[in-house]
Amino acid sequence: KPRMIEEKMLILLRQGKISKWFSGIGQEAISVGVTSAMEQEEYILPMHRNLGVFTTKGIPLSRLFAQFQGKMSGFTKGRDRSFHFGTQDYKIVGMISHLGPQLGVADGIALANKLQENGQITAVFTGEGGTSEGDFHEALNVAAVWDLPVIFIVENNGYGLSTPTSEQFRCEQIAHRGKGYGMEAYTIDGNNVLEVYNTIASLREDLKKNPRPILLECMTFRMRGHEEASGTKYVPQELMDEWAKKDPLENFEQY
């Protein structure tokens, strides 16, 4: 579903029927895999490339398209045409644009779950660029100290806006930062939907018995621009070619 919708949205963008679009093409396995492994009543805090969260949660496509086209029947009644919306009915919290702050919101939800002893887990998304914000440190530190049942999912897609990871941080992997917080951390193939699903499903069951935070780095690649108007001229073609061979849909079809 996400890929089909993405392709349609790119057509609508060229037709002038939507004003902008943040594409998640090539990264769909992460949002679909994570959401499929979560329970319907558990909160997820997605970001602007996680269309798969909304489709996997079962939101009617008519409402999604109304939202993206700025119609009154959308979730924000035409006030926003992107992913800055949530829905209590589907337990989705709307994204905060600079991404870091929503990690702290996830801590709050996880704390409520822990106090209520309801066994629910919270999943929150950010990008590798978002980990350079101070909110990332604060959220992970609090979650670690309080043993909050939250999974921090970092979609490492190679670029934060136009800045490559080599100019973002010195550690080899984002997951290595987990040690500094005394937190379990893993790096997985974000283009393999089965690996994403199995990892989240396994962690969920364990966290229900032993509440604690997890840092999960999903390796993937951004195949479009930060948003469609920016393009990808700053990305080496060999990188694009390499990751095109790792397309998550083709991976799953060949399984």
Give the label of every model feature segment.
Residues 1:
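Mature N-terminal segment immediately following signal peptide/propeptide cleavage
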Residues 6-146, 164-170, 175, 180-182:
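Cofactor-binding active-site loop characterized by glycine-rich and histidine/acidic residues
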Residues 92-255:
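Glycine-rich ThDP/TPP pyrophosphate-binding loop and its adjacent helix/strand module
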